[in-house]
């Protein structure tokens, strides 16, 4: 089973598209887009994704990608 990275369409439109595109290059990740992830307050202010259901954010796309990989390293699925 691969880690699941979920993005909100509104957050993608606000700037996380490049982070998602970078993560899509990794064949070991499942990337999913949703209309809403119910984090509206955070969505308006942060670049974020849900990683296996947990909120991960970053100030830039590069930091978001880095934080996602850091989270995955610190929280292995098995």
From Swiss-Prot:
InterPro entries per UniProt: DUF1450, UPF0349
Pfam families registered for this protein in UniProt: DUF1450 (PF07293)
Assigned protein family: Belongs to the UPF0349 family.
Entry protein name: UPF0349 protein BH3414
Species lineage: Bacteria, Bacillati, Bacillota, Bacilli, Bacillales
């Amino acid at each position: 089973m691969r880690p699941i990275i979920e993005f909100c369409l509104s957050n993608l439109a606000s700037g996380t598209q490049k982070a998602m595109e970078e993560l899509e290059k990794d064949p070991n990740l499942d990337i999913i887009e949703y209309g809403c992830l119910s984090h509206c307050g955070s969505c308006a202010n942060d670049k974020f994704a849900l990683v296996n259901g947990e909120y991960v954010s970053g100030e830039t796309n590069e930091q978001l990608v880095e934080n996602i990989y850091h989270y995955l390293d610190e929280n292995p699925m098995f």
